[in-house]
UniProtKB/Swiss-Prot annotation:
Transmembrane segments: none annotated. It comes from Laribacter hongkongensis (strain HLHK9). It holds the Pfam family RecA. This is Protein RecA. Residues 333-354 are annotated as: Disordered. GO terms for molecular function: ATP binding; ATP hydrolysis activity; ATP-dependent DNA damage sensor activity; damaged DNA binding; single-stranded DNA binding. HAMAP family: RecA (MF_00268). One of its GO terms (biological process) is SOS response.
Amino acid sequence: MAETDKQKALSAALSQIEKQFGKGSIMRMNETQVNDNLQVISTGSLGLDMALGVGGLPRGRVVEIYGPESSGKTTLCLQVVAEAQKLGGTCAYIDAENALDPVYAGKLGVKVDDLLVSQPDTGEQALEICDMLVRSGGVDVIVVDSVAALVPKAEIEGEMGDSHVGLQARLMSQALRKLTGNIKRTNTLVIFINQIRMKIGVMFGNPETTTGGNALKFYASVRLDIRRIGAIKKTDEIIGNETRVKVVKNKVSPPFKQAEFDILYGEGISREGEIIEMGVANKFVDKSGAWYAYNGQKIGQGKDNAREWLRENPAIAQEIEKKIRTAAGVGGMNEFVPSSEEQAEASLSEDHDQ
């Protein structure tokens, strides 16, 4: 077939597709919104934003955060919610575990009055609510806490000893098939928290696995493995956890990077502590003995005092953070970008006003 005949055949096929499935059902890459810059929401941790390679968690994607108990999974998700709310976003929390503490969420910076919360009875109900929120296009971040608590209706209505092999895995697989297209279209960030289980009889390799089957592993664009690696002490009192997060899967940047940060009890991720450490590493903050200095001005003796000084001077903390992000070539401090549906509504209202 000659080149001109090929082009004619392709043009005919494209016009037929558009006629049958609607305008925009197929187009060239440079004509689509796919080419737009990836929009991200900060995780609340500067180090983790850098490890993700794009400055935060990508919008329009599925993210899985898993780890052992008390490793900081819920804290990390609440920090993401707080960051999205700071930028004017709407967030929803599907609390399948019935364990969300509004007081703790408030301490992490979450605007509890503006947070949509659902405590569903069954796994089907939880995922249906999630799907309806995504399709509305009005929610920017949805957290599902957790996959392990998404109990199928058949299991709830059955007897305690009944066997329900693969029921939860089938539920997750079906839900994710429905969700992913809508998530991309509405530019929503959906985060699934997951727990760890042990595979019985594994002699070699890692015996750990996550609940809910394999579907989430495939559909997730980013998977984060979060672990508690130590305790933070002030005299004899433990005031927080040292935490390590490994990016085990990343479809938007190179994977397998990791970040370490402090989670302080009642405060969340210590952003100021990260700014000091990364500022010293990038030579934006000077360290001489126990003293820290910025632009020739001493900001504190010891990390705790320097952290306190930055907390009292947020403008300087933001200035140092901006320098670190610029040096690493990642964003994450940009203005909030509305979803495609919100943008369309805004342009329609502008046309109407004119």
